[in-house]
């Protein structure tokens, strides 16, 4: 069985490279302000969302600085496993902006790994199509949100067929 708490345990992602980069960023007062949220805080914050919002397949979630995906993964997991929303719909309603390109790539890899474990009908190409639209490498404060929108029901159906 897939254990979301273990999967989101930051110790599993404290790679030597990440620790080294974090030390350099801190030492040089890097403006990226990179910080990775522990599972306990992610869960506590997500527990504030109502059951009605979790279960509504039309509700969207926006993570303004998603790092390597702690909130995105928790939201996706909860909507699929606890609220029985199909993986394609759940993923298509999650949006994220991240400044660091390597974090975007890592988040996408982690989403694939989790979906392989929890979604029997998971399709990597479909997931990539959705994530390439919904997970953006950009500065949150300068991104044009007016032109960024959730996929329509028709677009979701088309993505599911591919």
Give the residues covered by each predicted segment:
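SAM-dependent methyltransferase catalytic region
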Residues: 1-162
